[in-house]
From Swiss-Prot:
Organism for this UniProt entry: Streptococcus agalactiae serotype III (strain NEM316)
Modified residues (Phosphohistidine): H180
Purpose of the protein: Member of the two-component regulatory system DltS/DltR. Regulates the expression of the dlt operon. Probably phosphorylates DltR.
All copies of domain Histidine kinase, residue ranges: 177-387
Enzyme class of the recorded protein, top EC level: transferase
A GO molecular function held by the record: phosphoprotein phosphatase activity
SUPFAM superfamilies: ATPase domain of HSP90 chaperone/DNA topoisomerase II/histidine kinase (SSF55874), Homodimeric domain of signal transducing histidine kinase (SSF47384)
EC number, UniProt record: 2.7.13.3
Primary gene name: dltS
Ranges in a coiled coil: none
Name used for this protein in its record: Sensor protein DltS
Entry's localization field: Cell membrane
Length: 395
């Protein structure tokens, strides 16, 4: 996670630098271009007015005269263009008239005489272009500069992300240690209460204590699961799995639970959808999603469960009728211990279940998302199918 955070920092830093540099380069280039054209126009205007080159020989200027019969005579040509190109271009420039001073790569000035003859001074700006070798050198130095900036950004990211990494590591360690420490006393409380239940049967206070200790045990187990999932170096047993079979096994268990809740669980499962993953974690995803759908669906409703293979992915979808949730609720559905603050969902709380499901899916290089279609809440999981994985993708 912290490696990804450092990469995002470098990417964001480099993106901002590149945008700023490109903007400054564009502004500087446009500024220089404007003054180059302005200086060039002053020169050609002076040449055309005096009817004489009268400037150093390295300036890329051609001086031509055109008589009243439109016959072109080249007085001098100090450009890289041929005389034929100069002649044709001169006639084109004459058509443009005095109002314009630029045509294509030419800056020009026209002096008209009373006998309808013309003197045209032409400067070819293309001759000012940076040579290819120099351009290539500039490109190499630019790339080298950006690579150097990327290396510096990566180095600095350690100091920026480091404190966050330290604090989060301490937090995870605290959660893990606290969860382990709480397991023993809670188990002892539950055992003692069960003994009391045998001695005082039917006591609703003892029943409530047993129920709450069970809930605490599940919560602690969820916290430990999240702690293990956050630690990417923890060992997992990835292998080839028939997701279709796993779905059928889990559905068989939850069909009776749905029936008890007076809800109907319908499934459409495509045969032989294979993935690579850790079997217990994949089952945990299915259990979390089905449990969530049954608990949060409306009474006497139908829950749709489907599995198919498309676009080199296994696509698992669970939808159920539900209240209409706000965008804020949908955006935070996978946040840990998210408590909805919504008029239609004032008692909605998802705990850690969906957070664990998201962590497992991401560990399997997949994607999970939630969206609503009218009164249907739909959860969709996408996992890479077998054959799309490589060994290097497995942590």
């Amino acid at each position: 996670m912290f490696s990804d955070l450092r990469k995002k920092f470098v990417f964001l830093t480099m993106s901002i630098l590149i945008v700023v540099v490109l903007f400054l380069f564009a502004v500087s280039n446009r500024y220089n271009q404007y003054w180059d054209e302005y200086d060039a126009y002053r020169i050609v205007k002076l040449v055309a007015k005096n009817d004489y080159l009268g400037i150093p020989g390295d300036e890329p200027i051609a001086l031509v005269t055109i008589d009243n019969q439109k016959m072109v005579k080249i007085q001098s040509n100090n450009t890289d263009l041929t005389n034929d190109v100069i002649e044709k271009s001169s006639l084109k420039l004459l058509e443009q008239g005095k109002k314009s001073r630029k045509w294509k790569s030419f800056i020009y000035s026209i002096k008209e005489y009373k006998d309808k003859t013309y003197t045209i001074a032409i400067m070819d700006l293309a001759s000012y272009e940076v040579p290819y070798a120099r351009r290539f050198l500039i490109l190499v130095f630019t790339i080298f500069g950006f690579c150097l900036l990327a290396a510096v950004s990566l180095y600095l990211s350690r100091f920026i992300v480091g404190p966050v990494e330290t604090e989060m590591t301490r937090e995870k360690q605290f959660v893990s240690d606290a969860s382990h420490e709480l397991k023993t006393p809670i188990a002892a409380i539950r055992a003692n209460v069960q003994v009391l239940e045998q001695q005082i049967p039917g006591n609703r206070y003892l029943d409530h204590v047993v129920s709450e200790t069970k809930r605490m045990e599940f919560l602690i187990e969820d916290l430990l699961n999240l702690s293990r999932l956050d630690e990417k170096r923890s060992k997992v047993n990835f292998k080839k799995l028939n997701l279709s079979v796993l779905c059928q096994e889990v559905l068989l268990t939850y069909e009776s639970l749905a029936y008890e809740e007076e809800k109907c669980l319908n499934d459409t499962i495509e045969d032989d959808v294979w993935i690579v993953g850790e079997e217990s974690q994949i089952k945990q995803i299915l259990i979390i999603l089905l449990d969530n759908a049954i608990r949060h669906s409306l009474s006497k409703s139908e829950i749709q469960f489907s599995l198919k293979q498309a676009r080199r992915k296994a696509i698992l979808t669970i939808s159920n009728p539900s209240a209409i949730y706000s965008k804020e609720v949908m955006d935070n559905l996978f946040e840990r211990f998210y408590q909805a603050k919504d008029d239609h969902a004032d008692s909605l709380s998802f705990g850690l279940g969906l957070s664990i499901a998201k962590a497992i899916v991401e560990r399997h290089k997949g994607r999970i998302r939630a969206y609503q279609e009218k009164d249907q809440l739909r959860l969709e999981v996408q996992l890479p199918i077998d054959g799309f994985w490589t060994n290097t993708m497995i942590n």
